[in-house]
């Protein structure tokens, strides 16, 4: 593939248009597969090495971040996390394009954040054809266990996503949302300063 052809593919990817596995092959050098393997096998006592590996793997890493192994990523280099981030075990980033998380984000076990989907018609899925759209998770979002966040979603400031949800559309700030598909069930208000659970 010529440089001009690579630029054309990257432009299509950036626009959320369909592209194939063969067309995406030029991006393989950006994958952090070996470093992710090393991170997932780092002893808990080696916090400094774990931090160093995470800085090498991800596109950007804030201060006071915790990402418990194992985690998985298509690239790693397209993931950006802010300060005071906490990610629990079995977090999967399908980061064919950017996944950006703000400050104070908390993510429970067994999440999938996927920027990539595939065409519905089988004739369009030749050569693993797909499309990719970035995910944005704003500051102070809390995502419950076993949630799937789909391509192009933005979750607004301070919101809570209930366990087991499939988030396929944007969620506004300061709301509680849950379900499959994920829907807003209520706003977060000052009354929640004196309660413990989202449903009470």
Regions found by a protein language model. Name each.
Residues 161-164, 170:
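Conserved metal-binding segment of the jelly-roll/cupin
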Residues 171-173, 178-181:
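Acidic, glycine-centered active-site loop in nucleotide-sugar glycosyltransferases
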Residues 156-159, 172-174:
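Conserved catalytic segment of ABC-fold P-loop ATPases
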């Amino acid at each position: 593939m010529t440089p001009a052809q690579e630029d054309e593919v990257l432009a299509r990817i950036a626009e959320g248009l369909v592209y194939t596995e063969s067309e995406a092959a030029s991006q393989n050098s950006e994958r952090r597969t070996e470093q992710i393997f090393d991170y997932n096998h780092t002893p808990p006592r080696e916090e400094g090495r774990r931090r160093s590996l995470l800085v090498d793997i991800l596109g950007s890493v804030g201060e006071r971040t915790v990402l418990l192994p194992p985690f998985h990523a298509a690239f790693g280099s397209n993931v950006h996390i802010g300060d005071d981030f906490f990610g629990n075990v079995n977090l999967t980033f399908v980061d064919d394009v950017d996944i950006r998380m703000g400050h104070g984000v908390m993510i429970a076990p067994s999440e999938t954040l996927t920027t990539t989907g595939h065409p519905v018609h089988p004739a369009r899925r030749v050569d693993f054809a797909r499309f990719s759209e970035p995910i944005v998770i704003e500051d102070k979002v809390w995502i419950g266990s076993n949630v799937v966040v789909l391509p192009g979603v933005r979750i607004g400031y301070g919101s809570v996503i209930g366990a087991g949800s499939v988030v396929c559309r944007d969620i506004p700030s300061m709301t509680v949302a849950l379900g499959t598909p994920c829907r807003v069930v209520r706003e977060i208000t000052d009354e929640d300063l004196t309660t413990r659970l989202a449903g009470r």
